[in-house]
């Protein structure tokens, strides 16, 4: 806005306005940023322009993703996940859901399903899993998707693209096989 206020160059004003208008649209902002940088580099007329150009790699809208496991999202880090989703900021959360505590030996967790047999739940887990997706949907502005990563790569990519395009927070809960599932033939038989 400072550049627009201090120039009579209509092309420069238009480039600045296009950048401002597209700032929340990642794809459109890439082109607007490229055009703005080209315009500013053509004539460095003041310290403000020089300062902007010195930080040009930070001009375009950034994609923000948080990746974590189900132990983090459903249990120890749930308060933080909920806080991020409640903020209504444009951030994407991707949860790798193995439905057990994979890093500590496959114990039942809040992501484990009722009746699921796991370490310390040999007779089956007695309580149902936390409804993380449903909890996120109660905000009304969170994009939520549940996928099985290895089952359908197109669906996985579609969910990621939709989450990225969503203006606001998104949550993808991705079922992910792990060694604790004792898949016949091992993890080499998993399509991820």
Set out the residue ranges of the language-model regions:
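N-terminal leader/propeptide and maturation segments of large enzyme subunits in energy/redox metabolism
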Residues: 1-51
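Conserved thiamine diphosphate
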Residues: 2-10, 58-60, 115-165
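Thiamine diphosphate
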Residues: 44-107, 144, 150-167
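Short secondary-structure boundary/capping segments
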Residues: 80-84, 107-117, 185-191
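Glycine-rich loops and low-complexity Gly/Arg-rich segments
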Residues: 90-93, 117-121, 169-171
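Short C-terminal domain-edge/linker segments immediately following a structured domain
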Residues: 96-99, 122-127, 176
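Glycine/aspartate-rich loop-and-adjacent alpha/beta segment that forms the canonical ThDP
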Residues: 156-192
């Amino acid at each position: 806005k400072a550049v627009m206020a201090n120039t009579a160059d209509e092309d420069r004003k238009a480039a600045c306005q296009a950048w401002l208008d597209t700032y929340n649209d990642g794809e459109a902002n890439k082109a607007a940023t490229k055009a703005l940088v080209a315009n500013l580099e053509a004539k460095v007329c003041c310290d403000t322009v020089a300062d902007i150009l010195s930080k040009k790699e930070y001009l375009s809208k950034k994609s923000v993703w948080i990746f974590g496991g189900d132990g983090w999202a459903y249990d120890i880090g749930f308060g933080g996940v909920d806080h991020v989703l409640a903020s209504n900021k444009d951030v994407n959360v991707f949860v790798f859901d193995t439905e057990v505590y994979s890093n500590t030996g496959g114990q039942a967790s809040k992501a484990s399903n009722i009746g699921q047999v796991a370490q310390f739940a040999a007779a089956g887990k007695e309580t149902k899993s936390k409804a993380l997706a449903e909890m996120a949907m109660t905000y009304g502005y969170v994009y939520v998707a549940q996928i099985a990563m290895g089952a359908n790569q197109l669906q996985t990519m579609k969910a990621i693209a939709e989450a990225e395009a969503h203006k606001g927070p998104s949550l993808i809960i991705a079922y992910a096989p792990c060694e604790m599932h004792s898949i016949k033939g091992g993890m080499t038989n998993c399509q991820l």
